[in-house]
């Protein structure tokens, strides 16, 4: 029995509860893994899931995919949350030879045709699937096609909107913003553009098939020398010759 004297009006002393370490750790991990979105401001932030968008006084729009024809279209984006509601609005960004690849939710790369039309039908990578992201400052970016040297542009005609690579210069219609997930941001690390690396899975994805050990070595060497595109073309020609020869 406790011999401590108590008086009327005294506040009850509450026993301190031990913190549940596991519960706290779980909460921290959950918070770290939540897909919070933020605008990209540096080149080394362009990795992982991303939303390419524009916003004006009327509404927000983002680059997206039309699932049946696999062409690129504009999709509405909530101008307040700036968060995608459809997987068709999200592209997976990766780096190749100081250029950027944009893979859609369909698992295919965004390409630019000679006429400037955009589509996502290619599983292998060539110059048409490679892009240069130019940092314009203040959160704005311009997307330049490696194959056509033209910029991704939003055009408006009356109530219709369309996208294509048609501009030779960075006009206002060619300025975009990019949303990325905070968990993919690289802190205190050198840019991937300064230290490019490539993995076997990436090479097989670009080649569109499984690769032998020798083929991987050849392509990795070509990547380091900056001639991967040419090496991939040679590989495809060789594969066709073996198939029909």
Curated annotation (Swiss-Prot):
GO terms for molecular function: actin filament binding. Keywords: mRNA processing, mRNA splicing, Nucleus, Spliceosome. Pfam families: FRG1. Residues 1-32 are annotated as: Disordered. GO terms for biological process: mRNA cis splicing, via spliceosome. It is found in: Nucleus, Nucleolus. The keyword Nucleus applies. SUPFAM superfamilies: Actin-crosslinking proteins. One of its GO terms (cellular component) is catalytic step 2 spliceosome. Belongs to the FRG1 family. Component of the spliceosome. This is Protein frg1. The gene is frg1.
């Amino acid at each position: 029995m406790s011999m401590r004297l108590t008086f009327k009006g005294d506040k009850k002393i509450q026993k301190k509860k031990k913190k549940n370490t596991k519960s706290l750790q779980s909460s921290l991990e959950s918070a770290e893994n939540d897909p919070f979105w933020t605008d990209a401001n540096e080149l080394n932030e362009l990795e992982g899931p991303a939303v390419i968008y524009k916003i004006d006084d009327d509404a927000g729009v983002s680059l997206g995919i039309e699932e049946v024809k696999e062409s690129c279209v504009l999709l509405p984006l909530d101008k307040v949350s700036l968060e995608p509601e459809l997987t068709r609005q999200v592209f997976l960004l990766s780096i190749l030879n100081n250029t950027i690849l944009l893979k859609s939710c369909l698992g295919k790369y965004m390409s630019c045709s000679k006429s400037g039309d955009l589509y996502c039908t290619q599983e292998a990578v060539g110059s048409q699937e490679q892009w240069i992201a130019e940092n314009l400052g203040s959160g704005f970016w311009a997307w330049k096609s490696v194959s056509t040297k033209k910029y991704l542009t939003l055009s408006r005609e009356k109530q219709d909107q369309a996208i294509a690579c048609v501009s030779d210069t960075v006009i206002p219609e060619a300025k975009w913003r990019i949303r990325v997930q905070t968990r993919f941001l690289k802190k205190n690390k050198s840019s991937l553009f300064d230290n490019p690396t490539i993995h076997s899975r990436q090479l097989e994805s670009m080649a569109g098939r499984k690769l032998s050990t020798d083929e991987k070595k050849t392509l990795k060497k070509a990547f380091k020398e900056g001639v991967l595109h040419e090496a991939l073309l040679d590989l495809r020609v060789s594969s066709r010759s073996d198939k029909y020869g």
